[in-house]
């Protein structure tokens, strides 16, 4: 199935790109510049596209991102430290982000004759991000069926929506994903900070999967404290 992968450059989406490529269906990667403070992730998406030998389309959505205020990812608020499941991480929500990006990706699929759009939303995202939940992805498919009725048919592929990030690490390793060439940290510094929710989740996922983590962190041990505090709460 000819498939576009929505690729941020993060561990999840790059692993998904490698999986789809191994299945023989990858046609292109699509990424979005929405003014995110961790824009360096797009460089890792470009690396993945070159490695996999497919076109990489970067959609400039900085004007859209500028009006999606209130998120630490696009505004001046600090990205909080701690586990993803913490209530404080809600400040990293960018309203309607996945709905907007997937709509553009489906339009591209219809225009270019691709049959599917794959996105790496996973079970660990459900607590914080409503547009990563099964209810959203199912409703989005129904909306696109209506939007493209009589013009094109495209499927939304969400192979990780009921799986954990540790499962994604396992799947990525199976398909030789170079994890060191992915970017997760929301703070966008020279190294992964090791303290924000996505760094903690990344470090924990490698631990649970039993696979060595090649990532260099500014604080490589904070994740244990964050998990312990979550468990005590």
From Swiss-Prot:
Query: Which free-text remark accompanies the cofactor?
Result: Binds 1 zinc ion per subunit.
Name the top EC class.
Answer: ligase
* Any Pfam family hit: QueC
| CC cofactor | Zn(2+)
Domain of life of the organism in this record?
Bacteria
Answer whether the UniProt record assigns the keyword Glycoprotein to this protein: no
A biological process (GO) of this protein is:
queuosine biosynthetic process
Family matches, as HAMAP family: QueC (MF_01633)
Q: Which PANTHER family match?
A: 7-CYANO-7-DEAZAGUANINE SYNTHASE
Q: What family is this protein classified in? A: Belongs to the QueC family.
- UniProt name for this protein: 7-cyano-7-deazaguanine synthase
